[in-house]
Amino acid sequence: VASVAASLFFGLKFTASPLPVPGLPEEPPGSTLMLFSALPWTLAGGWLGPIAAAGLGILSGLLRGFWDTHNFFTLLDLGLMAAIFAVFVRQKYRTPLFQLLRQPLAASLSLVPLHVLLFIFSAFFAVSSASVTERLDYAFSNAGMVALAFGGEMLFAGLVAQVVSAAFSAQWGGLGSLQPSPAERSIETRFVSGT
């Protein structure tokens, strides 16, 4: 229920560029920052794991795709972002990079470049009637606004999840002791670093 309400209310519309969708005579879509949209799946990612987070991300993507982006890739995009976020905050590797990714704020902000890449990919394949250069121009012209909107959502969700993870640290991220990261277990990496 929270995912439905969060995905549909409290949004800010950013107008992107004057470029419409290639081949369609319509107003440029822009990007919408739905402030609470990522909050349900980030909290589910920390408390319940990747499958629950992906389910809520897919539900959020379905609602956003229908009401906002009008793009099927939104469903897959947000489901994948939710699953990756859950994997980041629930992994138990001990190196500094993985310790940073265990923090919800860092994990959520690290998803922004990946989301932009997925947007460029989906915008490129969303309209097949236009030429390759028109589709690439449209995708790259709107990537900045997409990054701004998704970055705002992830900043808010990451801050809330950071507070929740500090307040309920026993329930957040699963149980288990820290283990060596893949780089620490690699004989090649250990040989090169001299340990």
What are these regions (language model features)?
Residues 27-30, 42, 46:
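Short, solvent-exposed segments of well-ordered alpha helices
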Residues 48-49, 60-67:
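Interfacial segments of multi-pass membrane proteins
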Residues 41-45, 53-57, 75, 103:
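Alpha-helical transmembrane segments and their helix-entry boundary regions
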Residues 1-10, 50-58, 107-111:
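Alpha-helical transmembrane segments
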Residues 8-36, 64-195:
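Membrane-embedded alpha-helical hairpins and interfacial helices in multi-pass inner-membrane proteins
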